[in-house]
Amino acid sequence: MIDQYKHKQLQIGLVSPQQIKAWAKKILPNGEVVGEVTRPSTFHYKTDKPEKDGLFCERIFGPIKSGICACGNSRASVAENEDERFCQKCGVEFVDSRIRRYQMGYIKLACPVTHVWYLKGLPSYIANLLDKPLKKLEGLVYGDFSFARPSAKKPTFLRLRGLFEDEISSCNHSISPFFSTPGFATFRNREIATGAGAIREQLADLDLRIIIENSLVEWKELEDEGYSGDEWEDRKRRIRKVFLIRRMQLAKHFIQTNVEPEWMVLCLLPVLPPELRPIVYRSGDKVVTSDINELYKRVIRRNNNLAYLLKRSELAPADLVMCQEKLVQEAVDTLLDSGSRGQPMRDGHNKVYKSLSDVIEGKEGRFRETLLGKRVDYSGRSVIVVGPSLSLHQCGLPLEIAIKLFQLFVIRDLITKRATSNVRIAKRKIWEKEPIVWEILQEVMRGHPVLLNRAPTLHRLGIQAFQPTLVEGRTICLHPLVCKGFNADFDGDQMAVHLPLSLEAQAEARLLMFSHMNLLSPAIGDPICVPTQDMLIGLYVLTIGNRRGICANRYNSCGNSPNKKINYNNNNYYKYTKDKEPHFSSSYDALGAYRQKRIGLNSPLWLRWKLDQRIVGSREVPIEVQYESFGTYHEIYAHYLVVGNRKKEIRSIYIRTTLGHISFYREIEEAIQGFSRAYSYTI
């Protein structure tokens, strides 16, 4: 359907019998109305043409060949005085054969039939609205008990005589002769309410607003009663309150959607378009048909038998009519949900027939496999691996995927820059992987975001936008911080990449879907880009050194194993000297020493710090103070060193750290400075 804003959408719900008939009804030039499927046949065994008024009828569902009717005529062969839209002989409309993918038919049921989804679903919507036990409603629908009090408000024989228990037996004896009389149909329509027709009458008599008011009053009474102390009674009261809330919500939903409750009982059964339930002829005279066709045949046969019995109701026994109604109900239940009545229907090879529910639901159903998970152009798929050098908004695309996605853009730029003269030569350059191709590809990718999606897409963070970069290999590289939004990890998970083509899609990707703009959970507002797993282990290894400060040198010096014998009588062991640990004036010098392998990642070192950033605690006492001949001194603390002159002025400060701490600090500092610049730019 298309709403007022021209957004294409799909809505599943209840429809009226008039709407079902409008989907399928056609009026021929001679005034004949077609659309009802009355025969269970499909194709004629001799001519291989669809049977008239059957499940594949061309009058109902449209022609098999575009513009050619069942007679073999085309629109050009129609006489001038005839309607050009229909064939006067066979009544087939001259339209495109693709109409058989969406043109529907219907089956006019001889008796009302309850929809199994609304009767046996959990919770049962019919039982909730009627406020009756599900077992009793099922017994009424499937004829387990033959008659009930009528739903009409006029006085009847059963209503007057069935109110007293001592008269029930005499009532039954007086009614039983009517089941074999010729006037059973009249008696049944007035005195007996059974089957789905009784459910439909009760649903039609409901006033949804009164249901909401009465349920609200009862809920308030139960709320005012409070707890009685009896666990069993309190439990029943809680269950009743939950039921009343659910009933009010259901009635409110029916009112808001303009849906009538009696539509849950079917009088017309829609028939799917033929292309959605095809019959395929294979080599060797083998025919492969959809299971839904067999289930439709079963419904039509039983419905025709019931219609025949109702026409001859004066001769047909009442028990036979009621039994046939039950068979029609079971056939429709099997069509909608084959497992609703216990054992599903099987074919001659003991294979279970697939019902409409089986075709729709599940991972291999119509929605998840065909509509939601179908293959689309300008998309790819690969395994994800960690990309530690990527920014939060970047992803690494393999060369093979990138050149396929951006092939048309690369061809356009090759021709625009006069690197090639036509498309054929451009494709050959791409096939031969010439250097100019990769240069243009990187230029194209620089201004074009891509979308990454991991199934199942349970919330909006399941698909996010990234700036692509070229990487070697055949895997997609991803920043580890964005994995939580996708619920992904690097143990073989796959992700799909899509290319937004239109300017509107690219603008939406940049403004709303970029990963660095989705840092909070849309459900609860908590940060969703937090370090986990590998990142936490990496940060731990990076900052594992320098925990005890300079005291570690006095009690467990760096490089001493537990089994190594230490000479504690040596006075130089406790004495601090500058030669033991290197001093660096900046972090760049420390990184250069690490690249030259003069220090390790967790080796302790002294780094000169800024004087304007005080790190000395007011109550902290130096561990050791060293004086030099020129009056300078060194105050040694647990994690820092203060160098002063003879005037007691601080000349420099050194902190005791490791290269891992320096690298971690630099990353945080750059991230904060980048955020500050971006924030000031937006202001």
From Swiss-Prot:
<keyword id="KW-0804">Transcription</keyword>
<dbReference type="InterPro" id="IPR000722">
    <property type="entry name" value="RNA_pol_asu"/>
</dbReference>
<dbReference type="Pfam" id="PF04997">
    <property type="entry name" value="RNA_pol_Rpb1_1"/>
</dbReference>
<feature type="binding site">
    <location>
        <position position="71"/>
    </location>
    <ligand>
        <name>Zn(2+)</name>
    </ligand>
</feature>
<dbReference type="InterPro" id="IPR034678">
    <property type="entry name" value="RNApol_RpoC1"/>
</dbReference>
<dbReference type="GO" id="GO:0000287">
    <property type="term" value="F:magnesium ion binding"/>
</dbReference>
<feature type="binding site">
    <location>
        <position position="491"/>
    </location>
    <ligand>
        <name>Mg(2+)</name>
    </ligand>
</feature>
<feature type="binding site">
    <location>
        <position position="69"/>
    </location>
    <ligand>
        <name>Zn(2+)</name>
    </ligand>
</feature>
<keyword id="KW-0479">Metal-binding</keyword>
<dbReference type="InterPro" id="IPR042102">
    <property type="entry name" value="RNA_pol_Rpb1_3_sf"/>
</dbReference>
<keyword id="KW-0150">Chloroplast</keyword>
<feature type="binding site">
    <location>
        <position position="87"/>
    </location>
    <ligand>
        <name>Zn(2+)</name>
    </ligand>
</feature>
<keyword id="KW-0548">Nucleotidyltransferase</keyword>
<dbReference type="InterPro" id="IPR007080">
    <property type="entry name" value="RNA_pol_Rpb1_1"/>
</dbReference>
<dbReference type="GO" id="GO:0003677">
    <property type="term" value="F:DNA binding"/>
</dbReference>
<dbReference type="InterPro" id="IPR006592">
    <property type="entry name" value="RNA_pol_N"/>
</dbReference>
<keyword id="KW-0862">Zinc</keyword>
<keyword id="KW-0808">Transferase</keyword>
<dbReference type="GO" id="GO:0008270">
    <property type="term" value="F:zinc ion binding"/>
</dbReference>
<dbReference type="Pfam" id="PF00623">
    <property type="entry name" value="RNA_pol_Rpb1_2"/>
</dbReference>
<dbReference type="GO" id="GO:0006351">
    <property type="term" value="P:DNA-templated transcription"/>
</dbReference>
<dbReference type="GO" id="GO:0009507">
    <property type="term" value="C:chloroplast"/>
</dbReference>
<feature type="binding site">
    <location>
        <position position="489"/>
    </location>
    <ligand>
        <name>Mg(2+)</name>
    </ligand>
</feature>
<dbReference type="GO" id="GO:0003899">
    <property type="term" value="F:DNA-directed RNA polymerase activity"/>
</dbReference>
<keyword id="KW-0460">Magnesium</keyword>
<keyword id="KW-0934">Plastid</keyword>
<feature type="binding site">
    <location>
        <position position="493"/>
    </location>
    <ligand>
        <name>Mg(2+)</name>
    </ligand>
</feature>
<feature type="binding site">
    <location>
        <position position="90"/>
    </location>
    <ligand>
        <name>Zn(2+)</name>
    </ligand>
</feature>
<protein>
    <recommendedName>
        <fullName>DNA-directed RNA polymerase subunit beta'</fullName>
        <ecNumber>2.7.7.6</ecNumber>
    </recommendedName>
</protein>
<dbReference type="GO" id="GO:0000428">
    <property type="term" value="C:DNA-directed RNA polymerase complex"/>
</dbReference>
<comment type="function">
    <text>DNA-dependent RNA polymerase catalyzes the transcription of DNA into RNA using the four ribonucleoside triphosphates as substrates.</text>
</comment>
<dbReference type="GO" id="GO:0005739">
    <property type="term" value="C:mitochondrion"/>
</dbReference>
<comment type="similarity">
    <text>Belongs to the RNA polymerase beta' chain family. RpoC1 subfamily.</text>
</comment>
<dbReference type="InterPro" id="IPR044893">
    <property type="entry name" value="RNA_pol_Rpb1_clamp_domain"/>
</dbReference>
<keyword id="KW-0240">DNA-directed RNA polymerase</keyword>
<dbReference type="InterPro" id="IPR045867">
    <property type="entry name" value="DNA-dir_RpoC_beta_prime"/>
</dbReference>
<comment type="subunit">
    <text>In plastids the minimal PEP RNA polymerase catalytic core is composed of four subunits: alpha, beta, beta', and beta''. When a (nuclear-encoded) sigma factor is associated with the core the holoenzyme is formed, which can initiate transcription.</text>
</comment>
